[in-house]
Amino acid sequence: MKYYLIAGEASGDLHASKLMNALKKEDPQAQFRFFGGDLMQAEGGALVKHYSEMAYMGFIPVLLNIDKVLHNIRLCKSDIEEFHPDVLILVDYPGFNLRMAKFAKTRLNIPVHYYISPKIWAWKEYRIKDIKRYVDKMYSILPFE
């Protein structure tokens, strides 16, 4: 299978790399393409964008880097479309990843799996509607999620 993964920060890179390792054991023909980091790259596949080039937290940093943020969104969408994976796997990072879920589901009809669900219990409860609409399978790492 062809897997496209998106992890936008260091902990996502760690969890996604472990997931990739497990997927390779179950699917020796696995092909990976991803936005991620060094740990994911060590598992193999094609690193499209390193998370260090896209991790902006808070309103002001996002605003100051809006051109880069929008470029990364466009790059990710076009790369997903070109690679056309069998599944899109999103790892946490909801501000970016929920946009990709909507795009993959509505424009490309690609199954969307979310590994490490967004913390809707902590903030932005409204995201639950988008998750229900655009995510096919959700995998939580905490028992109360």
Language-model-detected regions and their locations in the chain:
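Active-site and donor-binding regions of nucleotide-sugar-utilizing enzymes
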Residues: 3-145
